[in-house]
């Protein structure tokens, strides 16, 4: 049985021109999808997050917008 990889692929995209809140949620959305396929569907999952720097940079920008120091509590709790 030959199956295409694309049929078993879920992709979530976030661009650098999007607001920081949206960029910060992209990695968490991908993780949520991976957990769903693993826990609910019972499938094996391989999760890739390309350029994790975008995710951490967005977290710093959100902290700045909220008026908090990005490093006030150390690393972001989401890392």
Curated annotation (Swiss-Prot):
Gene3D superfamilies: 3.40.50.12240. Its EC number is 7.1.2.2. It is found in: Cell membrane. The keyword Ion transport applies. GO terms for cellular component: plasma membrane; proton-transporting ATP synthase complex. Transmembrane segments: none annotated. It holds the Pfam family ATP-synt_ab. Produces ATP from ADP in the presence of a proton gradient across the membrane. The catalytic sites are hosted primarily by the beta subunits. This is ATP synthase subunit beta.
């Amino acid at each position: 049985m030959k199956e295409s990889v694309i049929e078993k692929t879920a992709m979530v995209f976030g661009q650098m021109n999007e607001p920081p809140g949206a960029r910060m949620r992209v990695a968490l959305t991908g993780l949520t999808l991976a957990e769903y396929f693993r826990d609910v569907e019972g499938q094996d999952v391989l999760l890739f997050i390309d350029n994790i720097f975008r995710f951490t940079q967005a977290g710093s920008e959100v902290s700045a917008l909220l008026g908090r120091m990005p490093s006030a509590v150390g690393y972001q709790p989401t890392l």
